[in-house]
């Protein structure tokens, strides 16, 4: 049986050859420097570029870095695959586009000692207008319909205790498209202790987002159905 570690960094990746080296290097410099007993699990979601080969080169040099490959199934599926492969007592969920800086990870790790989760807040945020509008809509929907109070529930920067990641794997439907938001919902409905931390958000250095405006409507409808279904099955724990 694989040996448990203190921290697993879970990083989905799809066609990120332009940024993956920077993303991995930052984990090594900023995260591994804080937590000695840690690993990085990069899930290549069927990339058609050199993403996997670049990750493999890192893995060949550093045993703490693991590459997991799967057929293209989307960001949500890759995240769930990474959580299944992770061995950490806590999991740090990040993206491979290197938009969120990790220089403040030490503060995140220290805050996690007294919390179930630390959730980032991108401020200021550097994304296309349609994504900013979508984030505001999702925030309002989550607060009003599902009592999820966090400022940035879908942020790709969450440090979460293992028990909550396992709970996500229990309730998320097969092929979940928004597991990161589901995790925020579980934390809120489970009365978890959550710290919100402002994180540095940078303009995208390379590659392109996998969801274009034309596909966004279908994705949002599927995501809403998924959220509503899980919300109906997960009771609210009162504090």
What kind of region is each of these model predictions?
Residues 1-5, 171-239:
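Hydrophobic helical membrane-anchoring modules
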Residues 5-8, 28-41, 50, 63-66:
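Short loop->beta transition adjacent to catalytic acidic/histidine clusters or analogous donor-positioning motifs
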Residues 16-19, 47, 75:
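Donor nucleotide-sugar binding loop of glycosyltransferases
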Residues 16-31:
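Short, well-formed alpha-helical segments that are part of the catalytic scaffolds
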Residues 38-41, 52-85:
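Conserved donor nucleotide-binding strand/loop of the catalytic core
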Residues 44-53, 98:
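A conserved acidic beta->alpha catalytic loop
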Residues 70-85, 102-177, 204-219, 224:
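Acceptor/aglycone-binding surface of glycosyltransferases and processive sugar-polymer synthases
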Residues 91:
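Short aromatic/hydrophobic "clamp" motif used to bind/position activated sugar donors
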């Amino acid at each position: 049986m694989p040996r448990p570690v203190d921290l697993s960094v879970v990083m989905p990746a799809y066609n990120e050859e332009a940024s993956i080296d920077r993303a991995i290097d930052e984990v090594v410099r900023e995260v591994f420097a804080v937590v000695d007993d840690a690993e990085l699990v990069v899930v290549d979601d069927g990339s058609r570029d050199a993403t996997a080969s670049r990750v493999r080169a890192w893995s060949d040099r550093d045993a703490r870095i693991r590459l997991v490959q799967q057929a293209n199934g989307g960001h949500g599926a890759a995240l769930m695959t990474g959580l299944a492969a992770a061995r950490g007592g806590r999991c740090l969920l990040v993206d491979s586009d290197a938009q969120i800086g990790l220089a403040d990870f030490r503060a995140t790790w220290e805050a996690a000692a007294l919390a179930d989760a630390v959730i980032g807040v991108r401020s200021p945020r550097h994304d296309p207008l349609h994504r900013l509008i979508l984030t505001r809509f999702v925030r309002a929907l989550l607060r009003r319909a599902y009592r999820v109070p966090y400022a940035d529930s879908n942020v790709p920067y969450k440090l979460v205790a293992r028990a909550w990641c396992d709970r996500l794997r229990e309730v998320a439907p097969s092929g979940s498209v928004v597991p990161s938001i589901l995790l925020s919902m579980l934390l809120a409905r489970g009365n978890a202790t959550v710290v919100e931390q402002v994180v540095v958000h940078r303009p995208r250095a390379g590659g392109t987002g996998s969801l274009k405006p034309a596909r966004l409507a279908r994705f949002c409808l599927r995501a809403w159905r998924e959220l509503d279904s899980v919300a109906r099955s997960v009771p609210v724990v009162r504090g």
